[in-house]
């Protein structure tokens, strides 16, 4: 036991039910919380939620219904949502209204179960053309949806590339942030391998009393056991303020 208290699995919804149940039992036995899994099929190359297409809305809501069952099976609270590609045929204001509309419907499905979808803005360098890329945009959407079941997944790696100014943006978005993910830049490996001052970022998050999960959605700078130990030691270095 090296001290990890949570576990993420983006592909959890695609796994066999028997494996989901086994993973849930193992996590429960070890006192590990389930983190995010991706709730739906993401449209990387063509418009989805931004389009306002009713068939695509229905498809998304059906994914959410299925994700609720998965969440209950694996004792998850959070699920990742990415609204998909921008719709170049529509003004951004109309696209935003379309996204808000369907997320309100999804929130109505999630609220009775105490579950939370977290919207993840993704940077334009790695994922060009997506509708949602910046934290203020996600904040505006979550404020408009106005539901405890619709919050922001603030991926520090993505937002360092897209907008920087990390601590001020985290502060401004704080009341709508439900989850964090981690990765340094460049390289998307563990903290201390890039330009982000994770000691200060973590210190700020801790100072706000955050009790949620910090998801390690990054690679290792070295392979094998040596790389795994370097990751652990990196996290020890950046949380020395505690």
Regions found by a protein language model. Give the residues of each.
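Active-site-adjacent beta->alpha loops and helix N-cap segments on the catalytic face
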Residues: 15-26, 89
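Catalytic domains of carbohydrate-active enzymes, especially glycoside hydrolases
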Residues: 1-13, 75
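Short, acidic/polar
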Residues: 1, 18-22, 56-69, 162-171
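Active-site acidic/histidine proton-transfer and metal-coordination neighborhood
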Residues: 49-151, 161
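Active-site-proximal loop/turn and secondary-structure-junction residues that shape catalytic pockets
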Residues: 11-13, 40-43, 83-87, 121-125, ...
């Amino acid at each position: 036991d090296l001290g990890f208290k949570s576990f993420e699995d983006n592909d959890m919804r695609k796994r066999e039910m028997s494996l989901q149940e086994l993973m849930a039992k193992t996590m429960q036995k070890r006192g590990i919380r389930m983190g995010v899994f991706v709730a739906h099929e993401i449209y990387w190359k063509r418009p989805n939620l931004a389009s306002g297409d009713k068939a695509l809305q229905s498809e998304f809501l059906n994914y959410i219904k299925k994700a609720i069952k998965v969440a209950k099976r694996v004792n998850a609270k959070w699920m990742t949502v990415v609204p998909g590609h921008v719709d170049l045929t529509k003004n951004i204001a109309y696209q935003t209204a379309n996204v808000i509309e369907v997320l309100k419907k999804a929130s109505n499905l999630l609220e009775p179960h105490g579950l939370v979808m977290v919207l993840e803005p993704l940077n334009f360098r790695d994922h060009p053309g997506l509708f949602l890329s910046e934290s203020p945009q996600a904040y505006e959407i979550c404020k408009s949806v106005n539901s405890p079941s619709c919050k922001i997944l603030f991926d520090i790696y993505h937002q360092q590339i897209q907008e920087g100014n990390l601590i001020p943006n985290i502060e401004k978005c704080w009341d709508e942030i439900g989850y964090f993910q981690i990765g340094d830049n460049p390289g998307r490996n563990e903290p201390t391998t890039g330009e982000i001052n994770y000691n200060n970022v973590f210190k700020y998050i801790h100072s706000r009393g955050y009790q949620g999960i910090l998801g390690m959605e990054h690679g290792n700078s070295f392979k094998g056991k040596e790389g795994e130990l370097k990751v652990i030691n990196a996290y020890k270095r950046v949380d020395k303020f505690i």
